[in-house]
Amino acid sequence: MAKESMKNRELKRQLTVAKYAKKRAELKAIIANPNSSAEERWNAQVALQKQPRDASASRLRNRCRLTGRPHGFYRKFGLSRNKLREAAMRGDVPGLVKASW
């Protein structure tokens, strides 16, 4: 189990990313636009750098919904490998069966 503080920190990051997503996209569009002047690009880069560090989506970490474990995460199920195995053995995941050959 991950510490509650780590789970809360990750939740706070997700909220920050959602809050700044639109503004970040606008600034990045200005920076990537070849028709923008050099000054506009510069101002957009400065504004982007002044945003909080946690506003970037690359700072997010996928975590298991049940335990908060950051490694061995399966996106399709939102679970870590351990909890996914337990759920599959209980039959909680439709269509998922243990491999046998």
Swiss-Prot record:
Pfam families named among the record's database cross-references: Ribosomal_S14 (PF00253)
GO CC annotation: cytoplasm; small ribosomal subunit
Keyword GTP-binding (UniProt): no
GO MF entry, a single one: structural constituent of ribosome
SUPFAM superfamilies in the cross-refs: Glucocorticoid receptor-like (DNA-binding domain)
Gene Ontology biological-process annotations: translation
Keywords annotated in UniProt: Ribonucleoprotein, Ribosomal protein, RNA-binding, rRNA-binding
Protein origin, superkingdom: Bacteria
Family statement drawn from the similarity comment of this UniProt entry: Belongs to the universal ribosomal protein uS14 family.
Function: Binds 16S rRNA, required for the assembly of 30S particles and may also be responsible for determining the conformation of the 16S rRNA at the A site.
Summary of subunit composition and partner proteins: Part of the 30S ribosomal subunit. Contacts proteins S3 and S10.
Name this polypeptide is given: Small ribosomal subunit protein uS14
Species: Pseudomonas aeruginosa (strain ATCC 15692 / DSM 22644 / CIP 104116 / JCM 14847 / LMG 12228 / 1C / PRS 101 / PAO1)
Gene: rpsN
